[in-house]
Regions:
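Negatively charged
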Residues: 1-119, 133
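Von Willebrand factor
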Residues: 109-216, 218-221, 257-266
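Glycine- and acidic
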Residues: 122-132, 184-191, 226-229
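Phosphate/oxyanion-binding active-site loops and adjacent basic polyanion-contact surfaces
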Residues: 134-138, 193-202, 237, 284-288
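VWA/integrin I-like adhesion module and closely mimicked acidic/polar interface patches used
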Residues: 196, 206, 225-269, 278
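C-terminal helix of von Willebrand factor
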Residues: 272-297
Length: 297
């Protein structure tokens, strides 16, 4: 019991630190007067643990399979050479155009290039994510990506975002330096909630990612639609998001938005080269792990 109390106190202290960080960030004119609240479970219930144990086994097997593909690639890249079967890039592989999974790009890498990477995953928890299996697959993606990164020693943080009466609600599921080894279970608390004020949420997570010393920083947003909150929508919200993407690119944050709903063209317009069209929801976990794998190289 004493040990549990210590762990809970640590989580409370962590949440307070995250809240202070959130309070100190300038979110821009589009979010003037909006408060950002950080939520994090201080303890994990047996219910969440049981839920995780129920859904996780096939997802963890998928993670392990993806990890096994990394090792020969890392060895190959220590020697330099051409990378093939990439999900995005500037150079098309003419021999791969027949492929239907989108891995049709190539890139040439020099030997000994830096491979260090930190990852942040931000998941839209707006009410519309409850339609169909959107939230289920987003949660599965978080489970796969968390295990994938932790097993390979890649620092990862995972947040969900929505809105509440006070403004923006951010849910901390996994932290870079979590001490209680229970973040995998916290992922099961992810659910559809209210609206989405993407810009403020993105800025917080991007700032969080920028505290990492790794040279490459990958921020993945999973969303099913445009921003939708009181006083924050349409062209103003789009301009805010484009500005955030551009600002953090200058700070070595690579932002990708994985679109999983019916609003794909609007998301494409906002994020342009950072847009990922996820046609089949069941492929979302694999696609996101491949994206991380690509930046690990």
């Amino acid at each position: 019991v004493a040990a549990e109390k210590v762990q809970e106190d640590c989580q409370t202290e962590l949440t307070e630190e995250l809240q202070k960080t959130a309070n100190d960030i300038h979110y821009g004119n589009a979010h003037a007067g909006i408060h950002v609240t950080i939520h994090r479970l201080t303890s994990v219930s047996d219910y969440l643990k049981n839920e995780y144990q129920t859904v996780a086994p096939p997802l963890l097997r998928a993670s392990k399979k993806l990890q096994s593909t990394i090792l020969p690639l890392l060895k190959e890249e220590q020697q330099g050479g051409k990378q093939k079967n990439l999900l995005f890039g500037k150079r098309l592989d003419s021999h791969a155009l027949y492929k239907t999974d989108g891995t049709i790009f190539t890139r040439t890498r020099l030997p000994g290039e830096e491979k260090r990477l930190a990852v942040a995953l931000l998941i839209d928890e707006s009410g519309s994510m409850g339609w169909g299996d959107r939230m289920t697959h987003a949660r599965k993606t978080a489970i796969v990506l968390y295990d994938f990164c932790k097993s390979l020693g890649i620092p990862i943080t995972i947040y969900g975002h929505s809105t509440d009466a006070g403004g923006v609600a951010l849910y901390s599921y996994a932290e870079f330096d979590s001490v209680d080894n229970e973040d995998c279970y916290r992922l099961m608390d992810m659910c559809d909630r209210n609206g989405n004020r993407d810009g403020a949420a993105l800025r917080f997570v991007a700032e969080h990612l920028c505290t990492r010393p790794e040279l490459q920083k990958l921020l993945i947003l999973i969303s099913d639609g445009q921003p939708a909150d009181y006083g924050y929508s349409g062209t103003e919200a789009e301009a805010d998001l484009r500005g955030i993407k551009k600002e953090y690119e200058k700070r070595d944050v690579i932002l990708f938005a994985a679109a999983i709903g019916d609003d794909k063209e609007n998301i494409r317009r906002i994020y342009k080269d950072g847009f990922l069209d996820i046609t089949k929801l069941e492929e979302l976990p694999k696609n996101m792990a491949q994206l991380v794998k690509q930046h690990l190289k």
